[in-house]
Swiss-Prot record:
Matching Pfam families: SurE (PF01975)
Reaction it catalyzes: a ribonucleoside 5'-phosphate + H2O = a ribonucleoside + phosphate
Organismal lineage: Bacteria, Pseudomonadati, Pseudomonadota, Alphaproteobacteria, Hyphomicrobiales
Species this chain originates from: Rhodopseudomonas palustris (strain BisA53)
Protein name: 5'-nucleotidase SurE
Annotated Gene Ontology cellular component terms: cytoplasm
Enzyme Commission (EC) number: 3.1.3.5
Keyword Plastid: no
SUPFAM superfamilies, A to Z: SurE-like
């Protein structure tokens, strides 16, 4: 099995080494094509107005001056040649990708691009506590990732479906289990605009995350609830985003 690994944190991110180790537990034919720079939050951005710069940094390891989507396309359509990948793994992201994160995540977008290309694809993310100075417990993803991937692949990943896997912020032995979940919804906004001033007094802005303690209990069956209870969350996400329920009401209204 030929595996293509990518991420959005950049080619030198520690999580990329973890996803490569997970891939090597499944196959010895592993390729890494990842962004040269951090591309967190770029979603499914595609570079159409700028050329892509490709740099080989080691055997089967490539850096692309582009987005995760660019990397998967370059890997599947150019670098790997006539024999493209049988599996795309995107991650392991530093931080969870759940609820509304799914819309912004370059990690998930990398896996989505693999799915668009007809390749079974997984997005992998490791939750960690922003309130502590400790690094993510990468060993949790490393310990549980290969088994989850094997079982999901044995079950057969449907076309047009990407699997979003999130590992809880705990040691491998503290994981409560694995839950198949649905995408959750936060009860409050989690982005803020931070205004600052440069040396000339002119304003500039950062968009950032609100690091607040969420006291609301996540809805049962969601990715948020699973991680809160120290379960690994496995969420199948479809490319088709049509709201079938509202479509019928809309047809009646517009008829």
């Amino acid at each position: 099995m030929r595996i293509l690994c990518t991420n959005d944190d950049g080619v030198h991110a520690p999580g990329l080494k973890i996803v490569e180790e997970i891939a090597r537990a499944l196959s010895d034919d592993v390729w890494v094509v990842a962004p040269e720079l951090d591309q967190s939050g770029v979603s499914h951005s595609l570079s159409l107005n700028d050329p892509l710069r490709l740099r080989e940094i080691g055997p089967r390891h490539f850096a692309v001056r582009g987005t995760p989507t660019d990397c998967v396309i370059m890997g599947a359509r150019h670098i790997l040649g006539d024999k493209g990948p049988d599996l795309v793994l995107s991650g392991v992201n530093k931080g969870r990708n759940v609820a509304e994160d799914v819309v912004y995540s370059g990690t998930i977008a990398g896996a989505l691009e693999g799915t668009i290309l007809g390749i079974p694809s997984f997005a992998l993310s490791q939750e960690y506590s922003h309130d502590s100075r400790s690094a993510p417990l990468w060993e949790t993803a490393l310990a549980h990732g290969p088994k989850i991937l094997r079982k999901a692949l044995d079950a057969g990943v449907p076309k047009n479906t990407v699997i979003n896997v999130n590992f809880p912020a705990c040691a491998p032995e503290e994981v409560a289990g694995v839950l198949v979940t649905r995408q959750g919804k936060r009860n409050q906004g989690f982005l803020r605009v931070d205004e600052r001033r440069d040396g000339r007094g002119n304003p500039y802005f950062w968009i950032g995350f609100e690091r607040v303690v969420v006291v609301d209990t996540p809805a049962e069956g969601t990715d948020l609830a699973a991680l809160a209870a120290r379960y690994i969350s496995v969420t199948p996400l479809k490319l088709d985003r049509t709201d079938e329920g509202f479509s019928e009401a809309l047809r009646s209204t517009l008829a």
